[in-house]
Amino acid sequence: MSMSLDPVATLSPHPLLSRYAECSMWLARYMERIENLARIIDVTETFVRSGASDGWRAIVQINADEERFYASHSKATADRVIAFYVIDAENPTSITSLALAARENARALRPLISTEMWSQLNIFTQFLRGLRAEDIRPSEISQLCARIKQECQTHTGITEGTFYRDQASLFYNAGRQLERADQITRLIDIKYHTLLPVAAGVGSEVDISQWTSVLRSAAGYHAYRRVMAGDLRPSSVVGFLLKSEAFPRSLVCSLRHLHNNVSRLRSDYRLRDAGGIVERIEFLRAGLDDQTVGQIITRGLHEFLDWVQRQLQDVQTEVAQAFWPPPRPVSAPDPVTIEMSGQTQSQS
């Protein structure tokens, strides 16, 4: 008796698929966000040590956490921002909170994921929960961030090597690319307008150091140097982060992979509700492809990036409406809502 390998023949029942789809996408988003946040904290600590003044405030701005942060802190200092974003259990955007949310999604996915994937997430989460104030001092933060990034990259490697390639993996990869696109636009938006009024001027030692920090925050410094050696003009850096087809964290690259994953959900698994989402992603890609970097900057970089972020939020909303389970009955327990950068996930 032969076993069918047709992906359509192995579809899960719709409610089960919906739950797994949601958890797969948010697991990827949370782990990607943890790695991005650890990298930005690490780069900021190095950059501020060299004399920058607004680096810690920029982290709060990138994550759109001004209201939450300044409700309990009068100023964005190193100690306060690091504690807020690493160990603050009351902050849903802290690395520890994100890791706990990721583990809960992995728990729901336990029938689908490997023992290695589950064990590594558990070990990582327990490590973060054990952190104390002395572990996150500015003098220790670089080493800590390196450990966090390494754990996230280990998760990515285990997932790549063990996660079965079906709808769940497509939702996982779509979530990772959606998060990358959102994070890169936030980074460019805040950093570009923070760094433009540099008194020392374009091309100065301070200016070069600042734009180097932007590239390092996006894990793109060495890739950029390969193709743009010696050119650290703001427009060149922005162009690379937006439009490089070869840099995996660029906006254009993230949107291409996002489109591929959602398109496969429609074509390979006959999920017809993906059609409108594919069209929105195509609309978003066209908005990027139809303009040069110079045109985007001249017409308004902030306005363009704000438009991209709104389109990305609409993509997430439409995915949820198309594939997530319907709301629970009123008699059911209230879900715990995790709010991240203007987007939410309801966790039972």
Regions found by a protein language model. Give the residues of each.
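Alpha-helical transmembrane segments and their helix-helix packing motifs
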Residues: 2-348
